[in-house]
């Protein structure tokens, strides 16, 4: 155990057996991350809970009685925060969550193990919501290939799909918040969001690691712009 540049004690992991360097570095980062330790003390399932806490503490979009759709919810940190703030455990609000992975029960949260990109997922989510949503939030991240351009396209595609779903289910005045990377949401998506929402910005909460390119796009004040299908011309 040694001290880091801030004077705090730092845990180092000795390689054992066939542990890969990447696994060793990941474990060291987890052991030395103050948000990981705080999440355990506070009973949150992941450090990601503090990202949503910080964003909502500043922008106040999670309010009592609202309906929330949480895309890519597992292990459940964001759902825990949303459920508490909208009053889902006592029936004042509602949180609907989906993920490819299993997720343990959270009081007030209705969960379905679904691939959001599956054609049937949006309709299933609408059915679970039983009406419109006040907040659509996505902490989804695409599986990486190691090829930067391919990974960026996958990330953009995932965020665009989440934004499209948000535009279909959000009530007027609603909020969309989603994880993006590198330079943030691309120009096409930003144009769409600025058309459909009163306020659009990028935010990077303190709980997001400094060495990470992770950011969040926050769009508030949904205008309720209807989606118009392309016109067909009869010949």
Swiss-Prot record:
UniProt gene name: rlmE
UniProt function note: Specifically methylates the uridine in position 2552 of 23S rRNA at the 2'-O position of the ribose in the fully assembled 50S ribosomal subunit.
Recorded GO MF terms: rRNA (uridine-2'-O-)-methyltransferase activity
Annotated compartments: Cytoplasm
Signal peptide: none
HAMAP family (alphabetical): RNA_methyltr_E
E.C. number(s) listed in UniProt: 2.1.1.166
Family matches, as InterPro entries: RNA_methyltr_RlmE, RNA_MeTrfase_FtsJ_dom, rRNA-MeTfrase_E, SAM-dependent_MTases_sf
Disulfide bonds: none
Residues the record lists as binding S-adenosyl-L-methionine: 76, 78, 99, 115, 139
Family indicated by similarity: Belongs to the class I-like SAM-binding methyltransferase superfamily. RNA methyltransferase RlmE family.
Gene Ontology cellular component terms for the protein in this record: cytoplasm
The reaction(s) this protein catalyses: uridine(2552) in 23S rRNA + S-adenosyl-L-methionine = 2'-O-methyluridine(2552) in 23S rRNA + S-adenosyl-L-homocysteine + H(+)
PANTHER family the UniProt entry points to: RIBOSOMAL RNA METHYLTRANSFERASE, RRNA METHYLTRANSFERASE 2, MITOCHONDRIAL
Key words of the record: Cytoplasm, Methyltransferase, rRNA processing, S-adenosyl-L-methionine, Transferase
Name recorded for this polypeptide: Ribosomal RNA large subunit methyltransferase E
Entry annotated with the keyword Cell inner membrane: no
Active-site feature positions: 179
SUPFAM superfamilies: S-adenosyl-L-methionine-dependent methyltransferases
Gene3D superfamilies to which the protein is assigned, alphabetical: Vaccinia Virus protein VP39
Pfam family, one: FtsJ
UniProt KW Metal-binding keyword: no
């Amino acid at each position: 155990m040694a001290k880091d540049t801030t004077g705090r004690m730092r845990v180092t992991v000795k390689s054992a057996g066939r542990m890969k360097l990447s696994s060793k570095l990941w474990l060291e980062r987890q052991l030395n991350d103050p948000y990981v330790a705080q999440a355990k003390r506070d009973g949150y399932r992941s450090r990601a809970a503090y990202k949503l806490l910080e964003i909502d503490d500043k922008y106040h979009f999670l309010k009592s009685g609202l309906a929330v759709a949480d895309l890519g919810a597992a292990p459940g940190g964001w759902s825990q925060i949303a459920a508490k703030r909208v009053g889902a455990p006592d029936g004042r609000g509602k949180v609907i969550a989906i993920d490819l992975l299993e997720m343990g029960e959270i009081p007030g949260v209705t969960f379905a193990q679904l691939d959001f990109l599956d054609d049937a997922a949006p309709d299933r989510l609408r059915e679970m919501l039983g009406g419109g949503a006040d907040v659509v939030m996505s902490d989804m991240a695409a599986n990486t290939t190691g090829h930067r351009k391919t990974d960026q396209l996958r990330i953009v595609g995932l965020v665009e799909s989440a934004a499209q779903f948000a535009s279909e289910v959000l009530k007027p005045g609603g909020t969309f918040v989603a994880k993006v990377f590198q330079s943030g949401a691309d120009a096409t998506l930003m144009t769409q969001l600025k058309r459909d929402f009163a306020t659009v910005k990028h935010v990077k909460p303190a709980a997001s690691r400094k060495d990470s390119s992770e950011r969040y796009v926050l769009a508030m004040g949904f205008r309720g712009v209807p989606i118009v299908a392309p016109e067909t011309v009869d010949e």
